[in-house]
Amino acid sequence: SECLVGSEMCIRDSIDRVLANPQWGYVIRGILDDNVPAGTEYKGIKVLGRIANLNIILPENRLDEIAITLGLSEYYRLEEIVALCEKSGVHTKFIPDYNKIIPTKPYTEDILGLPVINIRYVPLNNTFNALVKRAMDIAGSIVGIIVTSPLMLLMCAIIKLTSPGPLIYKQERVGLHNQTFRMYKFRSMEVQPESEEKKAWTVKNDPRVTPIGKFMRHTSIDELPQLFNILKGNMSLVGPRPERPFFVEKFREEIPRYMVKHQVRPGLTGWAQVNGYRGDTSIRKRIEYDLYYIENWSIGLDIKIIFLTFFKGFINKNAY
């Protein structure tokens, strides 16, 4: 059993979580809060008194531990409350109020005695993990280039014969650490001024798309030149899909946590794509899947995504 000490809103949030998860085994016996009258109840749990009365209230109640929960604006009181709790001799915990700031599972580390809370856990920040993934990208891209070279040569010939212009279309995208790079694709549209293409997505029955281009976009064959982006180190086999700078600037203001996707290399395929979020689909849902991938990366997850891509990721129903 425990006693919650702190501010009303944080205490209510903690009570709601404990009551919603009985498997945790916690039983809250009471609340100490300076801003709520003694005897007030919240979901059957009473306010026992003020925080200053902790040493008086504790002997009257059998408690295994005390949990301190304060709003960010009240952290100046933390030292005082910890001192009172320590005098009680009861095991004390601190529940930081950072849910609005840190929306996902954080992790802590010790830097020469200085405790540091990392806002987001990114496995690929680990040097060993990053090297393993890069080795997998190099090997995979080389194999991919060799295996698909007959198909790529065929596409080059068809594009050249059916539409005037370059074979490869190079477009600026935003990648790792917000750095821009030129992403390669087989040209699937009529040649147009760069100023016209920067700020518009392709739409259904877009007249700019060539006949062979429509087929390539639908089957994702137009993405094959990105194997060279992977070999160069601009991209990875698996990761969040990169976007154009104009849209990145737009989405960073509209979608919370959008920019987190740039903490890893963008991918040829990704967790969002194999779950159906490709092309003209919800950006917010794509970001949810991208964040899951970033925070839960493993070699096994990459292999799973590559496997799923072969079975359901190539055909893009939302490609125009």
Where do the protein language model's features map onto the residues?
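A solvent-exposed beta-alpha-beta segment
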Residues: S1, S7-P106
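Glycine-rich flexible loop motifs, especially short His-Gly-Gly/GGXG/HXGH segments used as catalytic or interaction
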Residues: K46, R50, T104-V143, L167-K170, ...
